Structures are given as structure tokens and as C-alpha cells.
Amino acid sequence: MDTVVKLNNIFSGLPKNKKSKVLGRGIGCGKGKTSGRGHKGQKARSGVSINGFEGGQQSIFTRLPKRGFNSLLKHRYSIVNLSTIQRLIDSKKIEDVSAITKEVLYNLGVISSIKEKIKILGNGKLNTAVAIEYDFISKSAESQVTLLSNVSASKE
């Protein structure tokens, strides 16, 4: 006795995905000529939306003052801490400590691009003598690296 109508047993007989109407193919298709956009005007044209336009009201980005600037001399480099390098050595992800290059750091996901410049910072403690390829190094990091081995860090 399944005479009770429930949400899970209603059958409409209609297709699940209704096909969208093809626009602009003559008056016989129901959406021909103006394709449901009305006659003329800005909204009838393609690329209708003007970014930041608020219907004649002055837009938010012209109401607010200009602030700051982007410096052309900004240092753009990846920062690698000595603690990160020591952690990778301890977890045996870096086997060859005699040549830690940009490629090695990139493959391990420490830096996001091989083209980036690298700055080594002395955050953390380094227990292993390593040879690191870098572009910049802090004084504390350089002292830790040179303390462990004679020829260790190399500027690219």
C-alpha cells in the first residue's frame, strides 16, 4: 500500500537537465532578434558591466583616498631559516649536505620558484656542517654556518 506521496517517490516525468534555449536564431525560436535583451541601450550591448559603476553614484574607489605605493626597490626573496634546513636534514629529506642548491630546496617545497633569490636567516640552530647555495645571508646565519665548517656557504 504505497499510496502515500513522499518527496522521494514523486515522479514528474520531466527531464532532469533542461536544455538551455538557443538565442538569436530568428523569431520562431522564441528568443530571436534581441535575444531577450530588449531594444538598444547599454544593457543590450555585449560586455555590459562596467566595473565599479554604481548607477551614477560616485564609486567607492574614487570616494576613498589613494594610499601607499609599490616600491620598485623592494627586496623580493624567499626566506629560509637554518631551523628548516636542520629539520630537513634530521628527517633525511636532504641526504647530500655538501650541496644544498636552489633545486633541492624547490623540490622539497621550501621555496616556490627556482628563479627566486634566497636569504638564509639564523633562526634556529644548525648542528650539521652544510654547504648552502644562497643570494643573501644574515650575520647570525653566516656565523653559525662558518662555525661548523670551513667552506660551507656559497654565494651564487
UniProtKB/Swiss-Prot annotation:
It comes from the Bacteria. Disulfide bonds: none annotated. Pfam families: Ribosomal_L27A (PF00828). Keywords: Ribonucleoprotein, Ribosomal protein, RNA-binding, rRNA-binding. Binds to the 23S rRNA. Part of the 50S ribosomal subunit. This is Large ribosomal subunit protein uL15.
